[in-house]
Amino acid sequence: MKSEQINRFLDVLNEYHSLGIAEQIDYQKFYLYSLITHSTAIEGSTVTEVENQLLFDDGITAKGRSLQEQMMNLDLKAAYEHSMQLARKHADFSVEMLKALSALVMKNTGSQYNTPQGSFDASRGDLRLLGVTAGTGGQSYMNFQKVPAKLAEFCQLTNERRRQLMDTDDLMEQYLLSFD
């Protein structure tokens, strides 16, 4: 990233803090509704941000939306809230932690699968035991046999990088970690 871009980013961040924008709106709540609505839309949910607000704040389900869609949104909210607790504790990443988060995401919408390689249950956070593609004839994702080792490697590298960044006030490096 170029020096002028870094300086501009830091200037905008300082202006944001000095204006007190974070205190003017409930940013965490706004972010939560937006994140969940858009993330579940990728998976086919048609629940809107307003409908999620009613569901999360008041327990009012959306008319005309399937139970599965609404459970998908509630499950993702639970996983998000749990991940924020882990972040506040600075918990290390581990394969088991990621599987537990996956179980929360898929709690009410995940299924059990029986494959020639064995059975697994997405609602329990089990790692898949089959190949995955993006649509029929689409791009293939990593071979399922490589996933456990690659997840462990990801966790180790992320934990090492986080430890390095906890000892610095370099906002740019902390920001860039979210894209690594």
Predicted regions and their residues:
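FIC/Doc superfamily catalytic core
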Residues: 1-180
